Amino acid sequence: HLLQFNKMIKFETGKNAIPFYAF
């Protein structure tokens, strides 16, 4: 879900989160 994704993104280093979120 979006909320869960946001949490994962915050946990990541951002650089890895940017592409993950874009996908």
UniProtKB/Swiss-Prot annotation:
Contains 7 disulfide bonds. Keywords: Calcium, Disulfide bond, Hydrolase, Lipid degradation, Lipid metabolism, Metal-binding, Neurotoxin, Presynaptic neurotoxin, Secreted, Toxin. Disulfide bonds: none annotated. It comes from the Eukaryota. It is found in: Secreted. Its main location: secreted. It catalyses: a 1,2-diacyl-sn-glycero-3-phosphocholine + H2O = a 1-acyl-sn-glycero-3-phosphocholine + a fatty acid + H(+). Expressed by the venom gland. GO terms for cellular component: extracellular region. Its cofactor is Ca(2+). Belongs to the phospholipase A2 family. Group II subfamily. Snake venom phospholipase A2 (PLA2) that shows presynaptic neurotoxicity. PLA2 catalyzes the calcium-dependent hydrolysis of the 2-acyl groups in 3-sn-phosphoglycerides. This is Phospholipase A2 crotoxin basic chain 3. It comes from Crotalus durissus terrificus (South American rattlesnake). The lineage of its organism: Eukaryota, Metazoa, Chordata, Craniata, Vertebrata.
